[in-house]
Amino acid sequence: WAKRSDPDGRVPIVAELLSQSNEILDDCVFKEGNLPTGERVVIRTGLPGVYWRALNQGIPSSKSTTAQIDEACGILEARSEVDKDLAMLNGNTAQFRLSEDTAFLEAMNQTQAETMFYGNPGTDPKKFLGLAPRYGDLSADNAVNILNAGGSGSDNASVYLVVWGDNTVYCPFPKGSKAGLTHEDLGEQTVYNSDGTRLQAFATRYQWKNGLVVKDWRYVVRICNID
């Protein structure tokens, strides 16, 4: 408590030294998915054949080829439990809980931004597939959009150029759900400590359902191995 109050017993404004500027969350396009679990997209994989013809000659019919892909959304969730008596010590319960909310909101933002780049269901099935695994193989079909800067260090960086749009790259949220981060005040509850003892606490639930769809791989370029 002493670290979370000023000499007058009030809750001060906490210096958010761990905060980050995640412009990608402001830049990306959010769109309601067509599935309760995410988005089903149809991607064109081949163009129809077209022909030059001469007079009195016919041409064969042709058609394009497509593929269906289901992009699943991930569920990012956190729960805050603040000791009721601790929150009431300074006489401003709402302000104390708000100072705790700020930390959770920042953590949710940072995790979403990180997953948008590095999420990999192959190593963690609960996450959605991010940009780096999609554009991480220089021998893949989309390698034409991966530019190798040639760095050989152990801490190389990448730059991603993304054209956001409903038909290019966007972030779906499950059909019938809310976009973005939701905040639910669960009120006063009896909670358990790690030693099994109980106490009264104010509980808050945070949730963010989100995914990533690259409908047209040509609208993302990765410049990798920047030393």
Residue ranges and their predicted role:
Residues L35-A67:
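N-terminal low-complexity, intrinsically disordered segments
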